[in-house]
Design a protein with these regions (language model features):
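Feature captures the catalytic cores and cofactor-binding loops of soluble hydro-lyases/lyases
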Residues: 31-32, 36-159
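Short, structured beta-strand/loop micro-motifs enriched in basic residues and often containing a Trp
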Residues: 1-9
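C-terminal binding/interaction regions
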Residues: 25, 133-186
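A broadly conserved detector of short glycine/acidic/proline-rich loop/turn motifs that flank catalytic sites
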Residues: 9, 29, 64-66, 158, ...
């Protein structure tokens, strides 16, 4: 099913999304990769606040290239999500609900998604220039020393994504693999 949604990703909205849905996302998202996630989780462990309010937030696993003159951002394709798996349950426990990336997730992340009504969106790897066209504003908000991995606040319009894992733990990757194997056996 095709859905056009406006953030923030509330629990109610998350529960309307199902593995396999095509989603066009509009609203504010945040960028972070493994170094940024590590730093945020360290801050949380010390009782410190995060650089943004994580409640109902969606985090895009991306390290964008520098913007060319006249552009908001450079190429902004997804990075492999597995590198954030050690941190994703902690981020969801403080309110983050959406994650955008590519690739499979560990069972612990899927369990956290079920517990906290999280959604994992897949973005097309190799389509960073196309995805960058959906980004209308970009603002560096923290950890500038991390370069491309610094935290940014982005405003996106109609960002094309697929729900890979929904809040019930349904997993498009696993469903697709099972369907393929079933056909192969016939």
């Amino acid at each position: 099913m095709e859905k056009h949604i406006t953030l923030p990703l509330t629990e109610e909205l998350a529960k309307t999304l199902h593995a396999g849905d095509t989603v066009y996302l509009t609203g504010t998202i945040y960028t972070s990769r493994d170094a940024g996630h590590k730093r945020m989780c360290e801050a949380l462990a010390k009782g410190e606040e995060l650089p943004f309010d994580p409640k109902n937030a969606t985090i895009y696993y991306v390290g964008p290239t520098p913007a060319k003159p006249g552009h908001v951002i450079g190429s902004a394709g997804p990075t492999t999500s597995g590198r954030m798996d050690a941190y994703a349950p902690t981020m969801m426990s403080v309110g983050a609900r959406g994650m955008i990336g590519k690739g499979a997730r560990l069972p612990e992340v899927v369990e956290a998604m079920k517990k906290y009504s999280g959604v994992y969106f897949g973005a097309i790897g190799g389509a960073g220039a196309l995805l960058a066209k959906c980004i209308k504003k970009a603002e560096l908000i923290a950890y500038e020393d991390l370069g491309a991995e610094a935290l940014r606040r982005l405003y996106v319009e109609e960002m094309p994504l697929v729900v890979v894992i929904d809040s019930e733990g349904n997993n498009l990757y696993e469903e697709g693999r099972a369907a393929y194997l079933q056909k192969k056996e016939k």
